[in-house]
Amino acid sequence: CEQKILKAYEDLPDADIIIFDLHNKPTKLKPKIYLPKRLEMLRVCSCQITFKRASIIDNKLIFDVKLGAGTGNGAGEENKFLLDCYDKGLKIYHVPEKIAVMTENESTWFTGFDADFFYKQGMSTRYILGFGLSCTYGLYYAISKHNQYKKDISIFGALKNILSGIFDNKLTKKI
């Protein structure tokens, strides 16, 4: 795995960040080497991300402490990090090489697809994407993930809680 990562940076010397694939988690990214678009950053989990440390330090980029496990605000810290990097103009590539296996352990924050989960999803989405785009993404999320949560909450219940999280705007960064 280390050799795959080093070779990718050797082959892509202008890359600041490279997103890889995982052995046991299908990706929604294209199966080729390319520069993903902004919204594709929402399809990435943290264990897929590698970066040049100097690029992150030089651009004063950090993971947002308001998001992630332990914050009570929901997940998405890796997506916000990638979007911040994208907005700063860093070169972010996807290389369809599998570098790791994601082990499924008990989550420190996910307790099921309940009203609170969807509320926090709306809250973090608003914080990351702003109001307009978060409303559109919230609708997309409720529809596209329906098969995963339909035993726990209705699509209307999920959407209602997502929109409540978006409108309450408790993280108050983006308008």
Residue ranges and their predicted role:
Residues 34-56, 72-74:
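A recurrent flexible, glycine/aromatic-enriched loop bordering the glycosyltransferase active site
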Residues 51, 77, 95:
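A conserved hydrophobic position in a structured secondary element of the catalytic/binding core
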Residues 3-7, 80-84, 120-123:
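Alpha-helical elements of Rossmann-like donor-binding domains used by nucleotide-donor carbohydrate transfer enzymes
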Residues 54-59, 99:
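Short, well-ordered alpha-helical scaffold segment located
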Residues 1-38:
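Conserved donor NDP-sugar-binding/catalytic core segment of glycosyltransferases
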Residues 63, 89-103, 113-114, 133:
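Catalytic beta-strand/loop signature of glycosyltransferases that borders the donor
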Residues 112-175:
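Non-catalytic, C-terminal membrane-associated alpha-helical segments of glycosyltransferases
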Residues 68-83:
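Acidic donor-binding loop at a coil-to-helix junction in glycosyltransferase catalytic cores
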